[in-house]
Amino acid sequence: MPTTNTSALTETAYYILLSLQTPLHGYAIMQNIKSITNGRISMGAGTLYGALNALNEKKYIVECECDDPSRREYVITNDGKEVLKKEISRLEEMLQNAQTYFKED
């Protein structure tokens, strides 16, 4: 079980974890996020690598071996999957609340 609080993930962390269901290197993560969000999010390298370091420190992702030693690949851990599942549930609850209580004039 993750040893963190249940605070919301940042949008950056959410999309990185969502992207890392299979091992990917940094540039592929950026491209995947751009694709998932239909171009709405175009993440810069500084943002990506800062977030990767933070997620790695929390043990939500790990660096994995890859064929090309000049590239670092990352993959989500079981703790990362649990955190992602909780975030998806939180977002679903928010959407349900909006659909129930938001009234357009």
Locate each region found by the language model.
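Amphipathic alpha-helical dimerization/coiled-coil segments
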Residues: 82-105
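N-terminal helix-turn-helix DNA-binding core of bacterial DNA-binding proteins
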Residues: 3-47
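Beta-hairpin "wing" of winged helix-turn-helix
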Residues: 56-69, 75
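Intrinsically disordered, low-complexity serine/threonine- and proline-rich regulatory segments
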Residues: 1-7, 91-94
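Basic, amphipathic "hinge/linker" alpha-helix immediately C-terminal to the N-terminal HTH DNA-binding motif
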Residues: 68-88
